[in-house]
């Protein structure tokens, strides 16, 4: 593989995470405006965003098999066509059914692109370098989570319709589409070059189960937490602007943490540092949930920084449970994380309705504690050390 080709594929991976980050995180910013647009209460509007998460979940799950049937370049180019259709649907339809369908399509495109992006990184890089590359890739999710809410706020403050926010997000996919030209992708399945070596049946092991539970609980905990921080902060007497700043600070700190840990992780055993970070994140979230408004800004900055490497390290360790990185295994762990995304409002909505936003934040805290337990148990069964030793010889 040429260096310029590797750079193009790496940038496709970066932008695939930026696309998903923008779509998922911008939801909270535009939900109120979309509810007004359709004359619906915000609570029932949040349910329609489940279509976005369902699209992401289904496409990541199915793409574990589709990658071996449909070439990656074809998938990305077809995704561009779907993206144009979905954004056009949002702009020109006033029907809630069409809005839900467009959200589902956006989810499908996002899920396919993100699973391809993750696979490309696990395919091109090995060992600890894979972990730091995946972490840097994931930082684009946070970067988009910081940039696109600012773009949304800029547009909405000037009474520009909410669907232009999605048109701006579509520009990320335009960049991905342009990068596919003159770029060679790894061939998989029936398109892969034939070898005489027999294909070894891979055994995943119980470590994959622990990592999958950790992925689900981490994403559900993180999004359950960050989705209700503004409501919780407003309940404590903070202004909407200050509450929004808390969320922006979290993602900014998260992004800085990813850049820092993409360097730091090279010097540590991944399972051990993951356990330490998961424990720290659970403690810092508890400090935020039980602290005073004066300390909230500092505790959310610390939480963002120390939790930034958790999800990517879970995926990296998942890919290292077999000798050869398996798209099915990586996609399985990703799917579990996406189930967490999909369950965000399903789980936290009723909790907030009955017990208020703080109860949702404490539930998220409990989920982070589960992540810590799973990471600790992984230490007894993980195969990443033996596979790293094999690849280094």
Curated annotation (Swiss-Prot):
It is found in: Cell inner membrane. InterPro entries: MFS, MFS_dom, MFS_trans_sf, MFS_TsgA, MFS_TsgA-like. Keywords: Cell inner membrane, Cell membrane, Membrane, Transmembrane, Transmembrane helix. CDD domains: MFS_FucP_MFSD4_like. The chain crosses the membrane at residues 11-31, 51-71, 78-98, 101-121, 134-154, 162-182, 206-226, 245-265, 273-293, 297-317, 332-352, 361-381. Pfam families: MFS_1. The keyword Protease does not apply. PANTHER family: L-FUCOSE-PROTON SYMPORTER (PTHR43702), PROTEIN TSGA (PTHR43702:SF3). Belongs to the major facilitator superfamily. TsgA family. HAMAP family: MFS_TsgA. This is Protein TsgA. It comes from Escherichia coli O17:K52:H18 (strain UMN026 / ExPEC).
